[in-house]
């Protein structure tokens, strides 16, 4: 089952500048290289300064909260006969990035039994149509639900995504995506539940080794963790330990999910850790916090992260994220995320 991918909408970035032997060297030939943004800059409501930089030197990664087209979400798309429905209000954002990254927390299989309850997840394989519509480029399957229907379903999901042009984080080693001469490596790790076949599980030695391998192949290394305790504002010590481990091993950016609430960011050794983006496509309508999430927009200048913007969303109707347009509500979510960031008690090395 193959669906045609939507064309990415960021056309100014399509100029190929990688004509020299070292595209990275060319990227850094400018005398001006912006720094990692401060906490105040990250949580401001003004990121328009990026437009003053050369679009040819910029690459953007979009990361969402948990994507779970199972249970009520799966029922909705079947009812509407529209697998694009969850993404109709946000696809213009996710498509407008060089790389759109998700945590797909359910297998997508042919014979998914419909249900609106329970903790054993699956989604109809046609849900891949919505992912293609949303412009998803990379999916991490390193989580505690993708294996709910066994190793065969994990492989079926992996094959389905690959057939539709979506890269999948590997059980061993990085997956690489080249964006106009700058190579991004993605590594996904699950730290929730017991180890599952076909899923990359957290192991400190393995993480260090694979980050080292990724550093040899790519200019930018992104580590994706499924971690933490659900329904908490703050990361636990285990999350902080694993986040620091990845940065110490050479990661440039750490992306987290699983708690189903938004959690703070941390700047550690001039690198960024986002502990959790909240929910994105899920049916947890029973509280305000589980209906909220942020889309993380990570902008790189060459191999350097120079801007981070969080775009608040709210889920409606058991599975469709909508951008929050009310300025007060949007800033309330950002201010709360900033407050939790400032409260974060850092692990001292």
PLM regions with names:
Residues 3-349:
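Acidic, metal/ion-coordinating pockets
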